[in-house]
Amino acid sequence: MRQPNTQAEAQHTQPSVGSIAAHRPNTVAATVSGLEPDIDADLDAYEESEESQDGGARLPQGRFLDRERSWLAFNERVLELAEDPSTPLLERANFLAIFASNLDEFFMVRVAGLKRRIATGVATRSASGLQPREVLEMIWARSRELMARHAACFHEDVAPALAEEGIHLVRWSELAEKEQARLFTLFRHRIFPVLTPLAVDPAHPFPYISGLSLNLAVVVRNPVTGHRHFARVKVPPLLSRFLEASPGRYVPVEDVIAAHLEELFPGMEVLEHHTFRLTRNEDLEVEEDDAENLLQALEKELMRRRLGPPVRLEVEESVDREVLDLLVRELKIGEAEVYPLPGPLDLTGLFRIHSIDRPELKYPKFVAGTHRDLAEVESASAPDIFAALRTKDVLLHHPYDSFSTSVQAFLEQAAADPDVLAIKQTLYRTSGDSPIVDALIEAAESGKQVLVLVEIKARFDESANIKWARKLEESGCHVVYGLVGLKTHCKLSLVVRQEGETLRRYSHVGTGNYHPKTARLYEDLGLLTSDPQVGADLSDLFNRLSGYSRRETYRRLLVAPKSLRDGLVSRIHKEIQHHRAGRPAHVRIKVNSMVDEAVVDACYRASQAGVPVDVWVRGICALRPGVPGLSENIRVRSVLGRFLEHSRVFAFGNGGEPEVWLGSADMMHRNLDRRIEALVRVTDPAHRAALNRLLENGMSDGTASWHLGPDGEWTRHATDADGQPLRNIQEMLIDARRRRRGTATP
């Protein structure tokens, strides 16, 4: 396993501006012998505008890192957490499952998008200078390396360590006779009735293989005729991925099915069987127009998604060549897209193993507390959130501050309050048993005006969002689906309340989805406020989303696609002016993805002028830090851990009057051009200081993180020069909350 590197070990080649101008990232052709957060098909071309040059020389070619390579590097960081022996054991299994799930989505969306561009002849070079075919070949080679490392980590490291702790992941041949007998009974009663063997012969065409399904390719022989036949058995996805043969011993469900194939093909000889798994293009393409019912259009597209073309075939490395040739031929997939792996395939099944109740093998339990400004002192009664917000704004930092006693309680109190007249809410992703949805339904049924903007195009949550949209409509909520051609990704909630002779607006602007379950796992920020300017801004924005308002300027918001990119770029340029005048200047950015070329170029310009630029990014980063003459004043860091870093923050020195924004937008074309996104300006000085401290701590050399070098390589910094562990910022925040439950500062 690659050990964490100390700072002293992080030696990167320092390309000059001149060398970068002639540089194009190396591509590696896939070597095949006989035979990967926030992903989007965001493949727009970019040309530096004259305005962005700010009077300086044009920036060099080759200044952008390839985003697909960068995404694969992000998933490699996930894999490094699984490989790290200091990660709790069941969390290592969980990171293996996350890596596999991430890679599934990467192939379904990004690889599928590249193949579509190649097939349609849209061969525009990416900002990194690569043609789609070159990018695809790099992905095939790099993902093959990472998948091999992933399998090795499971087989050689995590599985043996689990066995030492009494959690045995075994194959059928390793089971005792009594265990096999028990599983045969389970097979007869619970598995056999739902299996459907499908033969392939002149009367039975090759069956449809659904995306991400696990399948058995079976070869049988008719003992009468001696003819060999191929059949396919799909492993039902509703069955548990690992079955408990006896306490602490788990076997893959496909092994149990394979051991009893004679039951499915009576009178035939089962000669061989091999597991395979297919990944298909599952990116949605919904053509919208003003007259179309978006709900119906999306439902039709979800049906078409099942038939997307194949983009990856995983097979057990022991697969028979004749069987593999048949699969490749019938599935119409290229040899370069075949990935032979040691079984078991589909290690997303390790999510099931992670759920085993062994707390000593997981991260220590953390229960979020109620934010101090919302908690009733020495009282068991529910806090009056509206009264608290009339006193001061509340800056929330989840999961360290409880979502259920803040944002959820805010909406539940609004639903039950007879003085509340209206609630307006965006929903991008929410849970199946959502108390947020329940509160909105309760409000509508009690006669309140409820507007819900449901983004039914949130990838891979479309079916759930359709379901909740209908449920909300049936209860009397006004449900709208946003603006044609734009996804609504902003996280907004507005409550209008009658208070005496006046109406007061209470608002929530956040970085995360209104999803109580993920709020315990995702790091996010949110601002609760009764500020009239924010309330007026949210009213205007909701009117734009539900009606025909064309308002594009706001008081305390920056809103994409009109003002957000330009607003941030102009503020970065203003830092250059402050720096030249000798005033305090800095740019600090925390995002999931840093890809947008205009924003990256603005950071380069700031660096060239001497402005320090810090970028804290979880996933993709196209920016090259540390290049002399271009970006020597830019640092890029990444933090991964038990919580998924999801907040977006933008902080500027602003000549000594700090300006800080938080909201939903990542620095990607899709967010800035094809989504409704919103950032809110944070005005409370204590909140601004708290957010700047958060950014400083995340970027500190004393914090465990990955550092990005100018060559695009990420280096893990987990120990100091003496080999002592660096501080973990997430654990530091947990400890702070345990010491002083719920404070105003993250």
From Swiss-Prot:
Reaction(s) catalysed by this chain's protein: [phosphate](n) + ATP = [phosphate](n+1) + ADP
Enzyme class: transferase
Domain of life: Bacteria
CDD domains: PLDc_PaPPK1_C1_like, PLDc_PaPPK1_C2_like
UniProt xrefs under Pfam families: PP_kinase, PP_kinase_C, PP_kinase_C_1, PP_kinase_N
Requisite cofactors: Mg(2+)
Annotated active site: 489 (phosphohistidine intermediate)
A molecular function GO annotation: ATP binding
PTM annotation: An intermediate of this reaction is the autophosphorylated ppk in which a phosphate is covalently linked to a histidine residue through a N-P bond.
Skewed-composition ranges (Acidic residues): 37-53
Residues reported to bind Mg(2+): 429, 459
Bias (Polar residues): 1-17
Alphabetical list of InterPro entries matching this protein: PP_kinase (IPR003414), PP_kinase_C_1 (IPR041108), PP_kinase_middle (IPR024953), PP_kinase_middle_dom_sf (IPR036830), PPK_C_dom2 (IPR025200), PPK_N_dom (IPR025198), PPK_N_dom_sf (IPR036832)
Keywords from the UniProt entry: ATP-binding, Kinase, Magnesium, Metal-binding, Nucleotide-binding, Phosphoprotein, Transferase
GO cellular component: membrane; polyphosphate kinase complex
The family this protein is said to belong to: Belongs to the polyphosphate kinase 1 (PPK1) family.
Role summary: Catalyzes the reversible transfer of the terminal phosphate of ATP to form a long-chain polyphosphate (polyP).
Protein name: Polyphosphate kinase
Organism: Streptomyces coelicolor (strain ATCC BAA-471 / A3(2) / M145)
Gene: ppk
